[in-house]
């Protein structure tokens, strides 16, 4: 399949990341590898979106610490970045609203075609050419001094060269006009870009719990965006899908990562990581990256808590 006809994908993972584990990063890597192997997708970026402090989960440390740990966990990645938008809102945001925020942001910033699974868009957003030196200003009076997500595309097919949080002197994001070329590869209007929710099979299983999720939100998440599921703890996504009429309805929008990996996906568990820290268990190095461990110890996180 030609690169111009492949769907370009940004993987978005929402969660507490309390703390972020090696398994969380493995989920991104495994999902990207699998999607590339299908020949239908090009994963150009990954976004980690930690939950707001008001989520109310026992033992949840402040978003300041969780954002810092996430940044340390991905500091050597050239395609996974941490986005603070969810943490900086006035209150907790639903997964659906986070997905919609990033979809709308990408429309404004990139000029790419962003499509739902079943209703692909045909009208790109019109703005300023990316390769021009002058940058128009996108006004947002609520930005204050908070980090702003800025996305700069490198060569399509090689992924995002940067998706990071900065504190600009001016409140700006770059736009792309309808005639702009993306380097020498293709026109922006020819790129179909989708944001897919990345999760483990445990989150997918929670869709089957009555009353836990808003029905209309589930419809949007699965029906409009789509999900990439990484199996964990021997929970098979296919079995979960068969237990939900809504998941069965949109089963073609649920992509299950199938690979030969022997990664023990249980190490995604932040709970096990916290317990290892509390008990001084040396196996914590199996769960957390060393920079995250160093940060936890320096900040005295989780050591004296039972969350």
UniProtKB/Swiss-Prot annotation:
Divalent metal cations. Mg(2+) confers the highest activity. ATP binds at residues 24, 271-274. Pfam families: CTP_transf_like. Pathway: Cofactor biosynthesis; NAD(+) biosynthesis; NAD(+) from nicotinamide D-ribonucleotide: step 1/1; Cofactor biosynthesis; NAD(+) biosynthesis; deamido-NAD(+) from nicotinate D-ribonucleotide: step 1/1. Its main location: Golgi. Disulfide bonds: none annotated. Its cofactor is Mg(2+). NAD(+) binds at residues 16-17, 92, 95, 200, 202, 212-213, 232. Keywords: ATP-binding, Cell projection, Cytoplasm, Cytoplasmic vesicle, Golgi apparatus, Lipoprotein, Membrane, NAD, Nucleotide-binding, Nucleotidyltransferase, Pyridine nucleotide biosynthesis, Transferase. GO terms for cellular component: axon; cytoplasmic vesicle membrane; Golgi membrane. Its EC number is 2.7.7.1, 2.7.7.18. It is a lipid-anchor. It catalyses: beta-nicotinamide D-ribonucleotide + ATP + H(+) = diphosphate + NAD(+); nicotinate beta-D-ribonucleotide + ATP + H(+) = deamido-NAD(+) + diphosphate. GO terms for biological process: NAD biosynthetic process. GO terms for molecular function: ATP binding; nicotinamide-nucleotide adenylyltransferase activity; nicotinate-nucleotide adenylyltransferase activity; protein ADP-ribosyltransferase-substrate adaptor activity. It is found in: Golgi apparatus membrane; Cytoplasmic vesicle membrane; Cytoplasm; Cell projection, Axon. Belongs to the eukaryotic NMN adenylyltransferase family. Monomer. Nicotinamide/nicotinate-nucleotide adenylyltransferase that acts as an axon maintenance factor. Axon survival factor required for the maintenance of healthy axons: acts by delaying Wallerian axon degeneration, an evolutionarily conserved process that drives the loss of damaged axons. Catalyzes the formation of NAD(+) from nicotinamide mononucleotide (NMN) and ATP. Can also use the deamidated form; nicotinic acid mononucleotide (NaMN) as substrate but with a lower efficiency. Also catalyzes the reverse reaction, i.e. the pyrophosphorolytic cleavage of NAD(+). This is Nicotinamide/nicotinic acid mononucleotide adenylyltransferase 2. It comes from Xenopus tropicalis. The lineage of its organism: Eukaryota, Metazoa, Chordata, Craniata, Vertebrata.
């Amino acid at each position: 399949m030609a690169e111009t006809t492949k769907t370009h994908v940004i993987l978005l993972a929402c969660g507490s990341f309390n703390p972020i584990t090696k398994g969380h990063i493995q989920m991104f890597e495994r999902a990207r590898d699998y999607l590339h192997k299908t020949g239908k997708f090009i994963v150009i970026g990954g976004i980690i979106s930690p939950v707001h402090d008001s989520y109310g989960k026992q033992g949840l440390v402040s978003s300041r610490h969780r954002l810092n740990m996430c940044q340390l966990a991905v500091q050597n990645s050239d395609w996974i970045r941490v986005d603070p938008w969810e943490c900086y809102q006035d209150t907790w945001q639903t997964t659906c609203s986070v997905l919609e925020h990033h979809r709308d942001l990408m429309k404004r910033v990139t000029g790419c075609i962003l499509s739902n699974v079943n209703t692909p868009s045909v009208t790109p957003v019109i703005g300023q050419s990316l390769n021009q030196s002058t940058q128009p200003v996108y006004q947002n009076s609520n930005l204050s001094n908070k980090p702003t997500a800025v996305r700069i595309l490198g060569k399509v097919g090689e992924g995002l060269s940067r998706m990071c949080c900065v504190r600009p002197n001016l409140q700006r994001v770059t736009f792309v006009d309808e005639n702009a070329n993306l380097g020498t590869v293709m026109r922006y209007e020819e790129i179909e870009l989708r944001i897919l929710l990345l999760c483990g099979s445990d989150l997918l299983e929670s869709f089957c719990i009555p009353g836990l999720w808003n029905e209309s939100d589930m419809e949007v998440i699965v029906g409009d965006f789509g999900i990439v599921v990484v199996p964990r703890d021997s929970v098979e996504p296919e079995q979960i899908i068969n237990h939900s009429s809504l998941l069965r309805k949109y089963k073609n929008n649920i992509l299950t990562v199938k690979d030969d990996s022997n990664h023990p996906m249980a190490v995604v568990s932040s709970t096990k990581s916290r317990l290892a820290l509390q008990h001084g268990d040396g196996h914590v190095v199996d769960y957390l990256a060393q920079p995250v461990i160093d940060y936890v110890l320096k900040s005295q996180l989780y050591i004296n808590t039972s969350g």
